[in-house]
Amino acid sequence: MQLEHLNLVVKDMQQSLDFYQAAFPHWNIRGEGKQTWYGVERRWLHFGDNDQYLTFNDQGYGENRPLQGNQVGMAHFAYRTVDLDGLISRMLKAGYAIHHEGAQSPYRRNVYFRDPNDYEIEFVEYSSDLPEQRNHYD
C-alpha cells in the first residue's frame, strides 16, 4: 500500500502549480475540471506522475493553521529525494526560500519550504539504505 494523493484546497491555482512544478519538474497535469463542492463552484487539478499526485482545488480562503501552534490539522508532508541539492537549487532559482532546515543527522538531510498556501513541505535525502540508520533520531 502507498499514499496515492493528497487533496489540497488552495487560494491561487497557478501560484500553487508554479511552486510544485519547481519541486517536481518531471510531474505533469494528469487531469483537471470543475465541480460544485457544497454549493461552491471550484476548479480542480491533478498534478503528478503515474504513481502519485497532488489534487489542487481553488476557491480556498482564510489562513492555514499556524505551524507554531498545536491546533488540529496538517503540520507538514514530506517527499524523499535522491538529489536534495538539486531540489534546493531549483526552488531557490524559482524564487522560493528555505523555511528552515531539519535536525542534524549523519544519515539524512532535510529542508522545509512553505508553498503559496502556507502548507509546509519537507524534502529529505537519506545517505543510508539501512532502516535502523534512516530511523535514527537523537
Region spans (language model):
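Flexible, glycine-rich phosphate/dinucleotide-binding loops
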Residues: 38, 63, 129-130
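Short beta->alpha connector loops
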Residues: 35-36, 59-61, 83, 104-106
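Vicinal oxygen chelate
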Residues: 3-12, 30-33, 42-46, 65-138
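Core segments of cupin and vicinal oxygen chelate
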Residues: 7-52
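Residue-level recognition of conserved beta-strand positions in structured domain cores
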Residues: 56-58, 125
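Short hydrophobic-acidic sequence motifs that mark active-site Asp/Glu residues
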Residues: 53-55, 120
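Short, charged/polar surface micro-motifs in flexible loops or helix N-caps
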Residues: 49-53, 60-62, 84
